[in-house]
């Protein structure tokens, strides 16, 4: 049942990854063109 476990992990990571990318893009958008990390 390794495939089922990996499938569950992937399904759990996808929303987290999308949320992280959305938050990062939103923060960069609010900061404007300031790209000093």
Swiss-Prot record:
**Which cellular component, as a GO term, is one annotated location?**
chloroplast thylakoid membrane
> What does UniProt give as the signal peptide span?
none
Q: Name one GO molecular function term.
A: electron transporter, transferring electrons within cytochrome b6/f complex of photosystem II activity
Biological process, per Gene Ontology: cytochrome complex assembly; photosynthesis
The keyword Thylakoid belongs to this UniProt entry's keyword annotation? yes
Q: Which residues cross the membrane?
A: 5-25
Domain of life, per UniProt, equals Eukaryota
In which compartments does the protein localize?
Plastid, Chloroplast thylakoid membrane
Q: InterPro entries attached here?
A: Cyt_6/f_cplx_su5 (IPR003683), Cyt_6/f_cplx_su5_sf (IPR036099)
- Membrane topology per the record? Single-pass membrane protein
Aminoacyl-tRNA synthetase found in the keyword field = no
Keyword set for this entry?
Chloroplast, Electron transport, Membrane, Photosynthesis, Plastid, Thylakoid, Transmembrane, Transmembrane helix, Transport
The cysteines joined by S-S bonds are none
Q: What is this protein's function per UniProt?
A: Component of the cytochrome b6-f complex, which mediates electron transfer between photosystem II (PSII) and photosystem I (PSI), cyclic electron flow around PSI, and state transitions. PetG is required for either the stability or assembly of the cytochrome b6-f complex.
Record text on subunit structure and interactions: The 4 large subunits of the cytochrome b6-f complex are cytochrome b6, subunit IV (17 kDa polypeptide, PetD), cytochrome f and the Rieske protein, while the 4 small subunits are PetG, PetL, PetM and PetN. The complex functions as a dimer.
By sequence similarity, the record places it as follows: Belongs to the PetG family.
Protein name, as recorded: Cytochrome b6-f complex subunit 5
Organism (species)? Arabis hirsuta
Q: What is the lineage of its organism?
A: Eukaryota, Viridiplantae, Streptophyta, Embryophyta, Tracheophyta
